Amino acid sequence: MILNLTDISDEPLQSQISRQVRAKILAGELGAGDNLPSIRGLARDQRVSVITVQRAYEYLEREGLIHSRRGKGFFVSELSDSAKKEMAKTRLLETLQAPLLAALAEGLSKADIQQIVQLLLAQSGDN
């Protein structure tokens, strides 16, 4: 599995791993039942500690995105479309919260922000 990790980011490596694996699952690049790389294997390939990968996998497991089978490794869990949609909504909310509060603090009105969101949606096409 190819991940793009960087140590110059403020984001911890375990968060980068979990975020990128989550994105691959939600985008369908990794499907239900797919076997994930072993913790040691991914740590070796990405040149990070085993603990870093273990923590990333534990986080993804708590989210319900992956599960472990004793002695066999980690696998992508079966997710309903509604579960995927709810996860995407949660991630969007988490991503937008800080910039939204900053925009309000800088004097933008709710109407200004709604106009910007509508513009972005219009630019994104029919999705």
Q: Which sequence ranges carry the predicted segments?
A:
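Beta-hairpin "wing" of winged helix-turn-helix
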Residues: 29-34, 61-71, 75-78
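Extreme N-terminal segment that seeds HTH/winged-HTH DNA-binding domains in transcriptional regulators
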Residues: 1-35, 41, 90, 94-126
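Short, solvent-exposed alpha-helical "recognition" segments
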Residues: 62-65, 123-127
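N-terminal helix-turn-helix
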Residues: 36-67
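Short alpha-helical segments used as structural interaction elements across diverse proteins
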Residues: 16-21, 37, 52, 66-69, ...
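Short hydrophobic/aromatic-rich motifs at helix boundaries and adjacent loops
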Residues: 10-12, 28-29, 44, 68-73, ...
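Short, cationic-aromatic polyanion-contact patches
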Residues: 14, 38, 72-88
